[in-house]
Amino acid sequence: MQTEHTAELNLLWGTLILEELARLGVKHVCMAPGSRSTPLTLAAAKQSKLSQHIHFDERGLGFMALGLAKASQAPVAIITTSGTAVANLYPAIIEAWLTHVPLIVLSGDRPPELIDCGANQAIIQPAIFAQYAKQLNLPTPDLNIAPQALLSLLDDAVCNQSQPVHINCMYREPLYPNEPSVDFSRYLAPIAKWQQQTKPYSQFATMNSGQMPTSDALARFVHGKGVIVAATLAPEQQSEELIVLAQKLGWPIVTDAQSQLRQHGGAIGNIDQLLQQPKSKALLAQAEKVLVFGGRILSKRLISYLNDQDWKDYWQVLPQQQRLDPSNKPKQVWIAPAHQFAALAWPRSSQANWALNLVQFNDELETLYQQQIDHAEFGEAQAIRAIAKRQTNEQQLFIGNSLPIRLYDMFAPITTSSANVFTNRGASGIDGLLATACGVAIAGAKPTTLIIGDISALHDLNSLAIARTVTSPFVIVILNNDGGNIFNLLPVPNEQLRSDYYRLSHGLEFGFGAAMFGLAYNQVDSLSDFIESYEYAMTYSGPSVIEVTVAQNQASEQIAQISSWVKQS
């Protein structure tokens, strides 16, 4: 057991850990205050390669890290103290695991002799995230454990990981160094070369076999009537290449809200509504082949279509191997970047332009939305369409769960440009949406809009403290329909149950919440006021809140009315 210079050795190990993580591609570190994580915090504070983000609430901290990792396309480190501080990261870790976002949790912990004996703030932390994180348990720092062993352990745990890693770091007291300097040169001698370099201690490279379909396989697959489905695709997956592929094959491409193509004029974006239109359903029923890029499709109608259709060939393209098909259809899964797969030497389909009428049907729905949403009573769909029309490819749009993402999926306009779209649709929770959007805004450093419901905003109100650290334009649009009105769309047995146990009307407004955190705030109840407030906010350097006040049943009644028209068209 190491007893001499304990605090200094703790700090040395923390310094080695943070330095190696920086070399492994970590650019951001998110920290919550705490004593047991002091060796990590002090090391991070002096690590110039890492941007530091501090927040008092570990749940929000985890989601901020998630947003930072999404937008920066790089792993993000999170430092917490021991106890329930670690447990508060769990929702963000689950979301990151399901959506393949690399987060690295560094949790301070009590030493073994203080676990399970009634010691303060001590819980069993190893494997706290169960199957949702790769686990590395470090011993208490000890001069008998070589520094190269520590670095090798880190490299093996973190390198090339696309999902969360939990590194549990046990520290004995004292935690705060008192001596100005301790000579560890003999201890560090084996890694002297590493200290002089900038590369990780160990490096791992995977040789890709590059197995792709042959030209004969491509020719056989495109023989017949087919559909391309653009499901969830991250901005870096260059989904525009899928439009080029669709034009080359002569097949329609239908798009999910998370595909980066929902507003594209060359795509069939209104697929959710078209699948309840008799003439569109009849046309789509002729399809024999399907090529799906990504997974986690939002529209239940599109999911049902893929499940119910008797496909001759079902191909799915994913960036990494995983099961992303609830229908469990027999299929060929190709592991490849979407844009690379789309750029293969595809021949034109033998049934090119077989579904050309879908383009007309899609355009007709856009005309219907202009008439029945844009020029109708002010409401949530109208606000979302107004936001979507004002996006450019130099902006970011984070869409919250529950009703906002569904309204965007159903009613987004056809436009010539659109923002990079971000969501949390792994576990699809309403927690941490504001914090995640803050991370996206900070890492992206571009004008960013968050569309979020009132219950989701209340759930993550603490994260307005993170929002005030954003320096680029960051507009938080809260759609306040006074409760969880997504349940208006679900078959709850009666209205009293819906009101008492599901909707949970609260009668709250967000003005004082914004004021508490010093954020600019506007409350609007008309389209003209909303557009004026939103366009101004997008020129404002920093965060602002726009609260859109609407009637409880406005969105659900509008959805039902439009659905009725579509079914009869």
Swiss-Prot record:
Recorded name of the encoding gene: menD
Record Pfam families: TPP_enzyme_C, TPP_enzyme_M_2, TPP_enzyme_N
Cofactor(s) recorded in Swiss-Prot or TrEMBL: Mg(2+); Mn(2+); thiamine diphosphate
Stated name of the protein: 2-succinyl-5-enolpyruvyl-6-hydroxy-3-cyclohexene-1-carboxylate synthase
Gene Ontology molecular function: 2-succinyl-5-enolpyruvyl-6-hydroxy-3-cyclohexene-1-carboxylic-acid synthase activity; magnesium ion binding; manganese ion binding; thiamine pyrophosphate binding
Lineage: Bacteria, Pseudomonadati, Pseudomonadota, Gammaproteobacteria, Alteromonadales
Keywords carried by this UniProt record: Magnesium, Manganese, Menaquinone biosynthesis, Metal-binding, Thiamine pyrophosphate, Transferase
Organism: Shewanella halifaxensis (strain HAW-EB4)
Reactions catalysed, as given in the entry: isochorismate + 2-oxoglutarate + H(+) = 5-enolpyruvoyl-6-hydroxy-2-succinyl-cyclohex-3-ene-1-carboxylate + CO2
Function (record text): Catalyzes the thiamine diphosphate-dependent decarboxylation of 2-oxoglutarate and the subsequent addition of the resulting succinic semialdehyde-thiamine pyrophosphate anion to isochorismate to yield 2-succinyl-5-enolpyruvyl-6-hydroxy-3-cyclohexene-1-carboxylate (SEPHCHC).
